[in-house]
């Protein structure tokens, strides 16, 4: 908590600004370009930057993104929407990470082989119309994408439509979205629920069915503070 309180050459604001706008040149070259534009005469070495960066709490970027998102929706004069709601999408992907001991300890490897590459899961909630990332995270390789989606939905608001792919087929997640005040659209595999299988065999164009939580789903709901109740859904 005592970092960045003294008047150093590389203060908190300059460090954050540099990280956010760093280009593709060498680290030292980027430092020279940056300080030539913001504070002429200052000389910061790459090693000094590395030392300062280790002291920077990564949560600062989460706070900055949250503030930026709130500012955008509060002040933008021409926010694009679809009717009266935002169209949000959740998706995740596996990401190969740098191969060093600290990264492996934090995120794990692609498999149990000792020479397997470090792997993480990135996940995000994205406003597809306005092209704004509302929430994102990078997580260990064994993280549950469904749980990550649930945490992202905490950034959704009343009336939002959340779009999810076939990997997010769990009932407790649907309940969590609805109880946050948002709606959802999910591409379900046929074998996701028996009601979906029956609908697919019926040759009907659409149907309203009720999904009932199993004992396992009820426990998952309890763990996450979700009310485990039957859910009426429209299949098309």
Q: Language-model features: where?
A:
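Single, function-defining residue in the core of a domain
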Residues: 1-25, 30, 41-43, 49-56, ...
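Residues within the helices of the helix-turn-helix
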Residues: 32, 36
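A glycine- and small-aliphatic-rich helix-loop capping segment at beta-alpha/alpha-beta transitions
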Residues: 106
């Amino acid at each position: 908590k005592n970092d960045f309180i003294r008047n150093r050459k590389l203060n908190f604001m300059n460090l954050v600004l540099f990280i956010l706008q760093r280009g593709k040149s060498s680290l030292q070259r980027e430092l020279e370009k940056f300080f030539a534009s913001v504070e002429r005469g200052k000389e910061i070495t790459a090693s000094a930057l590395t030392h300062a960066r280790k002291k920077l709490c990564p949560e600062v970027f989460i706070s900055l993104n949250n503030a930026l998102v709130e500012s955008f929706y509060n002040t933008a004069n021409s926010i694009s929407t679809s009717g009266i709601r935002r169209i949000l999408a959740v998706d995740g992907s596996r990401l190969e990470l740098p191969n060093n001991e600290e990264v492996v300890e934090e995120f794990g490897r692609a498999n149990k082989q000792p020479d397997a590459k470090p792997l993480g899961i990135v996940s995000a909630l994205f406003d597809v119309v306005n092209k704004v990332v509302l929430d994102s995270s990078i997580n260990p390789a064994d993280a549950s994408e469904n749980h990550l989606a649930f945490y992202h939905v905490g950034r959704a608001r009343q009336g939002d439509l959340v779009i999810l792919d076939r990997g997010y087929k769990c009932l407790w997640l649907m309940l969590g979205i609805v109880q946050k005040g948002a709606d959802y659209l999910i591409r379900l595999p046929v074998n996701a629920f028996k009601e979906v299988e029956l609908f697919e065999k019926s040759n009907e164009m659409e149907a309203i069915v009720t999904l009932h939580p199993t004992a396992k789903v009820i426990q998952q709901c309890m763990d996450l503070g979700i009310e485990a109740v039957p859910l009426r859904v429209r299949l098309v």
